Amino acid sequence: MNRRHRIYEGKAKILYEGPEPGTYIQFFKDDATAFNAKKHEIIDGKGVLNNRISEHIFSHLGRLGIPTHFIKRINMREQLIKAVEIIPLEVVVRNVAAGSLSKRLGLEEGTPLSQSIIEFYYKNDSLDDPMVSEEHITAFGWAVPQEIEDIMQLSIRINDFLSGLFAGVNIQLIDFKMEFGRLWEDEAMRIVLADEISPDSARLWDIQTQEKMDKDRFRRDMGGLINAYQEVAKRLGIINENEPSRPNGPVLVK
């Protein structure tokens, strides 16, 4: 097998050159990081679960007409995706106070918000991804006003869908992070959802018990990260519920 050309390696994923022009292969690693990689461990099986959960979500979003970079899953750890020009912003949608919002504003974690909040963060690890305003975004040329409007409208639609999807399996969507990119098709450009949506990038709580089912289990040294991710996958119908737990990892539905 020929050695693939590596385009980019991030904290949790690697991008390789795809088989066709305008495509990449996105590989999900087992690395768990927090606080901009100041905390780092390898957790066996995490990449497999994130790949399948993100595939499940992106496939649903695509069927709803929400444009994404996702083409198809290749194997347990890899997806074929469209090559996009990533906008250097993390877009966070918050439905319930938690994490940095609770710390910044002195809110008790778990406080419901009267409306969903959309926040923008400049993607720069050396600066710890500072929060920025729409004025910062346009002033520094990261995106133009119409692109910001497109991102916000897509974020609202995605949040509405995901909130319902997770509520249907007894999970509350507290908040989640997204990235968007510019997809060029001939002379036309459109904004599409990129990166991933998984328990790595979303806060997910069990509706009844408030048990955390996301990367906060790693951030806060709670343990049980893989079990929590497996439970999310099981509720979404990705893991076969009839299969017993196995030490070699979860059994995934083809």
From Swiss-Prot:
A cellular component annotation (GO) from this entry: cytosol
Reactions accelerated catalytically: 5-amino-1-(5-phospho-D-ribosyl)imidazole-4-carboxylate + L-aspartate + ATP = (2S)-2-[5-amino-1-(5-phospho-beta-D-ribosyl)imidazole-4-carboxamido]succinate + ADP + phosphate + 2 H(+)
UniProt-recorded Gene Ontology molecular function terms: ATP binding; phosphoribosylaminoimidazolesuccinocarboxamide synthase activity
Enzyme Commission (EC) number: 6.3.2.6
GO BP annotations listed: 'de novo' IMP biosynthetic process; cobalamin biosynthetic process
InterPro entries xrefs: SAICAR_synt/ADE2_N (IPR028923), SAICAR_synt_PurC (IPR033934), SAICAR_synth (IPR001636), SAICAR_synthetase (IPR050089), SAICAR_synthetase_CS (IPR018236)
Superkingdom of source: Bacteria
Pathway(s) per entry: Purine metabolism; IMP biosynthesis via de novo pathway; 5-amino-1-(5-phospho-D-ribosyl)imidazole-4-carboxamide from 5-amino-1-(5-phospho-D-ribosyl)imidazole-4-carboxylate: step 1/2
Enzyme class: ligase
Assigned keywords, A-Z: ATP-binding, Ligase, Nucleotide-binding, Purine biosynthesis
PANTHER family linked: MULTIFUNCTIONAL PROTEIN ADE2, SI:DKEY-6E2.2
Matches recorded under NCBIfam families: purC
Family statement drawn from the similarity comment of this UniProt entry: Belongs to the SAICAR synthetase family.
Protein name: Phosphoribosylaminoimidazole-succinocarboxamide synthase
Phylogenetic placement of the source organism: Bacteria, Pseudomonadati, Pseudomonadota, Alphaproteobacteria, Hyphomicrobiales
